[in-house]
């Protein structure tokens, strides 16, 4: 398109709304956020220059060839008539209109059409009417054509030779979302700048550079309206336009303001993250800068807390300030203000040293007068990693001058820490360090002044054998008179003042010490490289650092002059003054026992108590002087801080008067502690303590319960002990008012022995302080011991006993004696004591064989009470032994190292202390005794039964599924045990080995598939799958025939079920052995096709689904086709839309990708769509998938015996496979106790109703003659085993009535008082559902009855006694039971036998064989559930006759007679049933769920969007370790039990569509992670949203002569952890769903066929039992069928080949299945996967599929 000549009119029109363009981007690196006025001018200049330089000819275009850019259209092309285009394109300037022409009379008049403003539109000629604006000076919107001869001059640029060009401007993109508006504005502003309109863009202050004209405003409005549709504008933009829809300038101004604000925030964050400070600027300025940035960010809503701010500041510190990183990095609560205080202090100290530093520049003549001598004349011997670097130093040595005065100079630490310095740092002179510079390579210069000292540094000397220092400021543990002679290189003596330790604290936060000599008679402080090498520190002159042998950098080395120096800032200062010189020679003192070791040895007692004990010889073997007390004052034991944390101290000295009034052992204090929960049955849950008032001697005894007889046994024992051992009689025992002390049994015992019980008074908390404080102290010690040792919690009483032994031997600060001394006993010999939990090896005197190891790892607990041995805990044997045959395990690790409070190991100290007890290894030194290994006298410690709680500490690795090494061959157990202080696994069952720990995050149940090649044989594939486990030799022969077998699959299965795409058929595991599947001839195939009974050889078309059946056995009486149609006809299968035969759905459309993440399972497999591939050619060993925990003594190693976890939290492994069933679910407690219902009930009306119910229950008990009222028995005359506690419980029934029940405490009933073989039977839910279904089909009347106080009609055979009810006022008496009281173990069985006998003998009923509590006669069927009876009969009079007979013997109430033909509502065993005879029956629980679900504290959303499915595919449960506090864990487990308990109750009643989710979540009850809880909440929410759903049954057609019982089966292969499969079955009677089951397969299946066979085999037994029940209740013939969507399963069942199967588990199930099918006249048919309603039992389904499969039978 040719450009026309422009006239000299002041206005130039343009044919496009986006007029001036350049093909060259302007400032591509320009920040789009920066839109200030200065930048806008730059854009204008750049755009002008670009436009002036670009020329095109009329026949060419400057637009680059780009398919995404629209090219100018010729004039002949008509304009498009469609709307605006969102595509980006290049715009071209059109032919100019006459000068001064403007279509608009006013900017507010916008007569344009949308398509004309489209970026894709280019008008053909000058007649086109477009918005235009006048061109002015400084805004070159266009350029004149060459024909005009005129030149348009721009005042803002010097270019006057502009030629005719065609300019193209890239328009802004279309705005598509309000959230994208900020980014869109940036591109829009850039578009205006490229269009030479930068001057009208508002600046930061909101004003443009120049005024905008009306035409420019119109152009602005039009372009903004086109590219920013109103529906995508933010709210604040719409608010501006609502006031003035043309005020685009205000929108741009506010947008620029927002961009500037965002830019400032980003700059502040970048500045804060890149802070740098080295002291070169004042600290005040640095603080002001940082605080201003933080304040601005906080004001803008970006909160920077103290921790983050301090980390950013410290990261930027360098030079002398860098040291703050290592002193402040542990302060968790440090503030910015505190950090700046340190920075100011260093800065002021630095400035002060600079101002006060004298001039050290030497006169050159001083060098000539220097007559100092050197310590040696050899070259420095430097220990370096690069030996060649050593030669770089000159032949100068460190000098120790024998001068009378020391040349002490002020020292400063100015070196910088550099880990990668490659050249030695050299300084001109020592003054360079005081010029405010860092000691870096930038300050390094070479100098000839090599003999000057570098202040504040130590000279590294390879020739010096000892380290010498002039100042005593850094000497630790200094001692005078060292008796050491030191000479210099000239053999002259150097007097030594003292010897001590020089302690270093290097930059890696490690501490090291070496010996140092103090003398003021040397010129330099010398650091011996030889002594550094002795502590594993070398000088590396390649890197110029001090480092360890492993390469850890400790400190930099500075080269100053000709020598190498290290800074003194790594020295730890000491306040100990060094004595004056004394040359008297004394030998070095012997090594003392470190205080931390003694502190741990003596049960973590405090230093004062230990010193008193050593002074008074209550602890023997060594004296007070043998302990190093230097660290005792400031020493903090982290184990004590954790274990003994307390609120405040108790009042001391409050009981001195009692100590003066009584003799020893006459006044005792006692108290009981407990219970301790979550312990095995063999471990005690309580302990009772006794303390003598005078001597403070303590005793502790374990208790398993607080029964009266247990307490009495302890009192008898301690009184006899005191009487026989101390010849004393106890006069007074002080105790609290607990029931264990106030009971009559103990009171009489004390009265009989002449002992006065002294009880505490009300609100007197101090009166019982002695016993309470002792229990608290022992408990503190217990926690500390368990924390320090890492032993499991079930050994808690051993820690209590160890602490008691030690504390009886420690002196009291007041009495100056120990309790043992007061009692006249000898002091405790500490050489016989071991630290609690000390690892030892115990000799096995009776091994299993001669080659069995003789040593058993164990842990020392405490000295034995009954021998001279020691109680040792043996984790591998789960028991404790009393033995002297042990040796202490040596090593270098310490439990204390994780707290970094001491780097010492105490092996040598422990060896010296217990030297006399280390001799059992040398058998020739001692004589072995036959009784050295004695079982402990404590029953609770022997044969410990570990609690099945989750372990506190877990092993970190699990077996990879691709690991070819069996778990038993792991080499962890082959490591030599040689570590001391090795931690025992906290709460870890010693049976758990590292190889059988369950699921790991890395473990995958999906095998990796490689080299998949299609064979072209109907979807068969060849897979190369890595082995999951080594295959035994016996399997080789079987696998050799793998290639001959086939797995026939149906090709058109529905999306998420088994297809030949999801489960790739493979030759070994996907199908059967070739000898098992019969060969089918062509004739047989043809015959089957003719009879429309397709075989598994050919897949029938999907639209012929009604004939997709394979009958297994054809009875002679019914044709095959009729049987098929009869069974499938009435089933509630989904109606599928018809499909065209020519349309083939994409089989991969809805399949999720196969990846390892699916194996972690959502809800244990939710999200699986059977997209798992079977294993090729070699089978996986079933032993590798066992989830049972096996005993393994070889798992004792150094790894799993350490526990570094804090005591407040536990890590729990996801042991999903350990949960066998939902049996552990605790029901929700709906009953109230007496105090809840009556005593403390604030609801007066409810309280009155409960009182009325209470009296009604008492009257009923008396009426039923429940107990013998003729005689009352004294409690002491009756065997306590036969005494049963009782209580009242209250509840509100569903009908609103209030009920009270007097029950016995059967949970604590002694086993000798009942026959464990008796069974309490109730009607099975399947029997009830079967009876209801038959009642609907046969128009039966349903009558509901209730027998009041049913159990009280049954006599009791055993001799049992109970305490009378409280209202009788006979607490000291017992009454004998005559009737079966509710709560007793035998009451249910007694009632069952009673009512069974009555129904059979008096009512003429008989019990159906195999179905307890189902009785029938010729007219009536009865279902019995405890005291509820459901009667079914076609004649209502027959029911009434039974009722009349029952009323003769029992108090029978008619709940619902069931007469009438209208809809009748029942509440039968929790089911809300609506029944209209001969029409329908609806089963639901809407009222019950509406009442119960809100009480679960689940955040329900009653008005929100309802969930349409209980779960969705693709959700996976993480199986990472769960770290959670113990209390929170118990709370969440209890919450899960409540939620899953209620869901399980509802699911098994009638919501069979939820059973898969319920079963899977039930496996995670002991793993209550946030994800599991959320999924559980989602399930409860779905139950709430669908609480009105009902199980719908319709009456069967009366023309049907037979009853049809069908089981539909399905399996989801390998979608559970550890290759387990989920199986499900749904049972239907006459087309009505009566039950369902979803569970995890007990065996690990290796193919989909095995899983399907497992599912069918699980359904057959129950199908046969139901068949027997139906035939007993209804005499019609019955047809039994089993439907499955697995053709290979049908083929195996049909086959008569009895060759050996692939494995015995698979073969056994298949053979049993064949026998059951053939022997029970059972039909097996194929059902399309799309119609298989059992799919909902095995996997989560999409919403559409879920509704399709369930809406026919539950809605």
UniProtKB/Swiss-Prot annotation:
Q: Which residues bind Mg(2+) 1?
A: 671, 736
Residue ranges annotated for the Integrase catalytic domain, each copy included: 660-835
Motif Bipartite nuclear localization signal, residue numbers: 1178-1212
**Name this polypeptide is given:** Transposon Ty1-DR1 Gag-Pol polyprotein
Using the UniProt record, give the first listed, main subcellular location. cytoplasm
This protein's species is Saccharomyces cerevisiae (strain ATCC 204508 / S288c)
What S-S linkages are listed for this chain? none
Q: Which residues form the Reverse transcriptase Ty1/copia-type domain?
A: 1338-1476
Instruction: Look up the EC number in the record and give it.
Output: 3.4.23.-, 2.7.7.49, 2.7.7.7, 3.1.26.4
Q: What is the lineage of its organism?
A: Eukaryota, Fungi, Dikarya, Ascomycota, Saccharomycotina
Q: Which CDD domains match?
A: RNase_HI_RT_Ty1
**Location of region: Integrase-type zinc finger-like:** 583-640
Biological process according to GO: DNA integration; DNA recombination; proteolysis; transposition; viral translational frameshifting
Provide the residue span(s) of the region labelled RNA-binding.
299-401
């Amino acid at each position: 398109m040719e450009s026309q000549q422009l006239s000299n009119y002041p206005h130039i029109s343009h044919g496009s709304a986006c007029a001036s363009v350049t093909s060259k981007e302007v400032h591509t690196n320009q920040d789009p956020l920066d839109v200030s006025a200065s930048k806008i001018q730059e854009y204008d200049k750049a755009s002008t220059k670009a436009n002036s330089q670009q020329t095109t000819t009329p026949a060419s275009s400057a637009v680059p060839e780009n398919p995404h850019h629209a090219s100018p259209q010729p004039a002949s092309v008509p304009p498009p008539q469609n709307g605006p285009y969102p595509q980006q394109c290049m715009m071209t300037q059109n032919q100019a209109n006459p000068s001064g022409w403007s279509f608009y009379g006013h900017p507010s008049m916008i007569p344009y059409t949308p398509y004309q403003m489209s970026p894709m539109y280019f008008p053909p000629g000058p007649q086109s009417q477009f918005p235009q604006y006048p061109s002015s000076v400084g805004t070159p919107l266009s350029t004149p054509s060459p024909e005009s001869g005129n030149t348009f001059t721009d005042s803002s640029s010097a270019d006057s030779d502009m030629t005719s060009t065609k300019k193209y401007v890239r328009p802004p993109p279309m705005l598509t979302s309000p959230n994208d508006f900020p980014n869109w504005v940036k591109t829009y502003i850039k578009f205006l700048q490229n269009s030479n309109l930068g001057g009208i863009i508002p600046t930061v202050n909101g004003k443009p550079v120049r005024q905008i004209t009306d035409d420019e405003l119109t152009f602005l409005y039009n372009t903004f309206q086109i590219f920013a549709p109103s529906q995508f504008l933010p709210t604040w933009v719409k608010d501006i336009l609502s006031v003035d829809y043309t005020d685009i300038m205000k929108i741009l101004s506010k947008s620029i303001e927002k961009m500037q604000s965002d830019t400032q925030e980003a700059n502040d964050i970048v500045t804060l993250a890149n802070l740098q400070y080295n002291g070169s600027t004042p600290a005040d300025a640095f603080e002001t800068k940082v605080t201003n940035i933080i304040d601005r960010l906080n004001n803008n809503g970006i909160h920077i807390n103290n921790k983050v701010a301090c980390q950013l500041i410290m990261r930027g510190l360098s030079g002398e300030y860098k040291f703050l990183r290592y002193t402040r990095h542990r302060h968790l609560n440090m503030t910015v203000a505190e950090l700046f205080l340190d920075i100011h202090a260093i800065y002021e100290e630095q400035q002060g040293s600079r101002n006060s530093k004298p001039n050290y520049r030497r006169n050159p003549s001083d060098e000539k007068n220097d007559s100092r001598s050197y310590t040696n004349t050899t070259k420095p011997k430097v220990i370096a990693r690069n030996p060649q670097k050593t030669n770089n130093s000159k032949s100068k040595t460190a000098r120790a001058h024998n001068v009378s005065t020391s040349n002490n100079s002020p020292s400063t630490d100015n070196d910088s820490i550099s880990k990668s310095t490659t050249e030695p740092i050299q300084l001109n002179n020592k003054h360079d360090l005081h010029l405010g510079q860092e000691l870096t390579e930038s300050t390094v210069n070479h100098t000839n002044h090599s003999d000057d000292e570098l202040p504040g540094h130590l000279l590294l000397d390879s020739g010096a054998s000892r380290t010498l220092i002039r100042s005593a400021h850094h000497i630790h543990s200094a001692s005078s008179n060292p008796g050491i002679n030191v000479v210099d290189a000239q053999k002259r003596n150097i007097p030594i003042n003292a010897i001590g330790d020089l302690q270093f604290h290097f930059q890696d936060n490690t501490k090291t010490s070496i010996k140092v000599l103090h003398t003021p008679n040397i010129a330099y402080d010398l650091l011996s490289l030889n002594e550094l090498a002795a502590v594993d520190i070398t000088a590396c002159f390649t890197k110029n650092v001090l480092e360890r042998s492993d390469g850890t950098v400790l400190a930099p080395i500075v080269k100053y002059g000709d020598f190498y120096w290290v800074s003194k800032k790594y020295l730890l200062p000491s306040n100990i003054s060094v004595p004056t010189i004394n040359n008297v020679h004394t030998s070095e003192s012997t090594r003392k026992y470190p205080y931390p070791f003694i502190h741990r040895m003596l049960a973590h007692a405090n230093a004062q108590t230990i010193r008193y004990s050593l002074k008074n010889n209550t602890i023997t073997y060594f004296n007070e002087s043998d302990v190093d007390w230097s660290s005792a004052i400031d020493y903090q034991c982290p184990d004590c801080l954790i274990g003994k944390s307390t609120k405040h101290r108790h009042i001391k000295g409050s009981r001195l008067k009692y100590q003066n009034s009584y003799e020893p052992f006459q006044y005792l204090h006692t108290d009981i502690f407990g219970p301790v929960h979550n312990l095995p049955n063999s471990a005690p849950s309580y302990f009772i303590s006794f303390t003598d008032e005078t001597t403070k001697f303590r005793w502790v005894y374990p208790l398993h319960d607080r029964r009266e007889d247990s307490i009495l046994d302890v009192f008898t024992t301690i009184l006899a002990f005191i009487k026989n051992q101390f010849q004393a009689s106890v006069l007074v025992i002080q105790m609290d008012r607990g029931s264990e002390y106030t009971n009559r049994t103990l009171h009489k015992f004390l009265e009989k022995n002449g002992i006065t019980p002294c009880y505490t008074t009300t609100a007197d908390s101090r009166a019982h302080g002695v016993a309470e404080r002792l229990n608290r102290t022992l408990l503190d010690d217990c926690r500390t011991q368990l924390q320090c040792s890492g032993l499991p919690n079930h050994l808690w009483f051993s820690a209590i006993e160890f602490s008691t032994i030690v504390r009886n031997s420690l002196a009291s600060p007041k009495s100056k004696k120990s309790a043992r001394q007061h009692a006249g006993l000898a002091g405790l010999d500490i050489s016989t004591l071991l630290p609690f939990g000390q690892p030892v090896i115990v000799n096995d005197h009776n091994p299993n064989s001669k080659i069995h190891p003789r040593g058993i790892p164990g842990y020392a607990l405490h000295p034995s009470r009954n021998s001279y041995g020691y109680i040792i805990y043996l984790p591998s044997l789960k028991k404790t032994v009393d033995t002297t045959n042990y040796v202490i395990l040596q090593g270098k690790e310490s439990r204390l190292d994780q707290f970094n409070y001491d780097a010492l190991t105490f092996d040598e100290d422990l060896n010296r202390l217990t030297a006399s007890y280390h001799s059992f290894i040398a058998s020739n030194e001692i004589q072995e005794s036959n009784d050295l290994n004695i079982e402990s006298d404590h029953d609770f410690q022997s044969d410990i039964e570990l609690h099945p709680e989750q372990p506190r500490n877990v092993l970190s690795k699990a077996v990879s599924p691709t690991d070819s090494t069996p778990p038993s061959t792991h080499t962890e157990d082959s490591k030599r045990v040689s570590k001391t202080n090795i931690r025992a696994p906290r709460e870890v069952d010693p049976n758990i080995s590292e190889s059988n720990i369950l699921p790991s995050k890395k473990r995958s149940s999906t095998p990796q598939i490689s080299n998949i090649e299609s064979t072209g044989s109907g979807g068969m594939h060849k897979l190369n799958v890595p082995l999951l486990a080594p295959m035994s030799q016996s399997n080789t022969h079987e696998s050799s025939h793998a290639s001959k077998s086939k797995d026939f699959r149906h090709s058109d299965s529905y999306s998420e079920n088994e297809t030949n795409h999801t489960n790739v058929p493979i030759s070994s595991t996907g199908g059967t052995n070739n000898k098992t599947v019969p060969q089918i001839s062509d004739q047989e195939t043809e015959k089957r096709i003719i009879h429309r009974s397709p075989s598994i050889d050919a897949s029938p078309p999907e639209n012929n689904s009604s004939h997709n059946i394979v009958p297994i056995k054809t009875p002679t009486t019914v044709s095959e086709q009729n049987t098929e149609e009869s069974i499938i006809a009435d089933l509630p299968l989904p109606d599928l839309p018809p499909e065209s035969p020519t349309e083939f759905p994409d089989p991969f459309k809805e399949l999720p990708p196969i990846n390892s993440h699916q194996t972690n399972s959502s809800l244990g497999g939710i999200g699986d769509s059977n997209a798992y591939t079977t294993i090729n050619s070699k089978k996986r060993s079933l032993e590798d998938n066992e989830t049972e925990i096996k005993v393994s003594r070889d798992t004792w190693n150094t790894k799993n015996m350490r526990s570094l976890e804090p005591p407040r939290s536990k890590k729990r492994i996801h042991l999903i496979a350990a949960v066998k069933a939902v049996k552990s679910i605790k029901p929700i407690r709906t009953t109230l106790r007496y105090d809840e219902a009556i005593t403390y009930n604030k609801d007066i009306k409810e309280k009155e109703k409960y009182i009325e119910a209470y009296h009604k229950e008492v009257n009923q008990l008396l009426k039923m003659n429940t107990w013998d009222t003729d005689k009352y028995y004294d409690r002491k005359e009756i065997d306590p085993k036969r005494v049963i506690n009782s209580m009242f419980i209250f509840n509100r029934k569903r009908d609103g009535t209030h009920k009270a029940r007097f029950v016995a405490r059967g949970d604590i009933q002694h086993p000798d008082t009942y026959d464990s073989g008796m069974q309490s039977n109730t009607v099975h839910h399947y029997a009830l559902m079967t009876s209801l279904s038959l009642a609907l089909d046969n128009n039966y009347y349903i009558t509901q009855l209730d027998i009041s106080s049913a159990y009280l009609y049954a006599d009791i055979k055993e001799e049992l006694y109970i305490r009378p009810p409280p209202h009788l006022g006979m607490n000291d008496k017992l009454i004998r039971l005559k009737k079966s009281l509710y709560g007793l173990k035998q009451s249910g069985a007694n009632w069952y036998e009673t009512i069974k006998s009555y129904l059979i003998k008096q009512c003429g009923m008989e019990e159906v064989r195999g179905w307890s509590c189902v009785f029938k006669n010729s007219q009536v069927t009865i279902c019995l559930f405890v005291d509820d009876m459901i009667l079914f009969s076609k004649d209502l009079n027959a029911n009434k006759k039974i009722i009349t007979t029952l009323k003769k013997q029992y108090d029978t109430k008619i709940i619902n007679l069931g007469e009438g033909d209208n809809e009748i509502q029942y509440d039968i065993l929790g089911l809300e049933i609506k029944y209209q005879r001969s029409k329908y029956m609806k089963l639901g629980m809407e009222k019950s769920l509406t009442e119960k679900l809100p009480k679960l504290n689940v955040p329900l959303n009653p008005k929100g969007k309802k969930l349409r499915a209980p779960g969705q595919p693709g959700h996976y449960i993480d199986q990472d370790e769960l770290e959670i506090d113990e209390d929170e864990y118990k709370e969440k487990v209890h919450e899960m039990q409540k939620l899953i308990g209620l869901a399980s109750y509802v699911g098994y009643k009638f919501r069979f569509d939820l059973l898969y989710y319920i079963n899977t979540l039930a496996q995670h009850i002991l793993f209550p992670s946030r994800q599991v809880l959320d999924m559980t909440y989602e399930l409860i929410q779905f139950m709430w949203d669908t609480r009105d759903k009902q199980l719908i049954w319709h009456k069967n057609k009366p023309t049907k002569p037979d009853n049809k019982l069908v089981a539909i089966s399905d399996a989801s292969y390998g979608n559970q952890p550890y290759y387990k499969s989920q199986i499900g079955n749904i049972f239907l009677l006459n087309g009505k769903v009566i039950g369902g089951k979803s569970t995890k397969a007990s065996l690990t299946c290796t193919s989909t066929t095995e899983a399907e066979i497992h599912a069918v085999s699980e359904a057959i037994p129950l199908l046969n039992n139901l068949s027997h029940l139906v035939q007993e209740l209804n005499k019609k013939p019955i047809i039994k069928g089993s439907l499955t969507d697995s053709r290979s399963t049908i083929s195996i069942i049909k086959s008569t080949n009895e060759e050996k199967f692939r494995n015995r588990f698979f073969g056994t199930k298949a053979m049993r299945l064949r026998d059951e099918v053939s022997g029970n006249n059972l039909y097996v048919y194929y059902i399309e996967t799309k119609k298989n309603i059992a799919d909902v039992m095995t996997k989560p389904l999409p919403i559409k599929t879920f509704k399709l499969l369930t809406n026919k039978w539950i809605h």
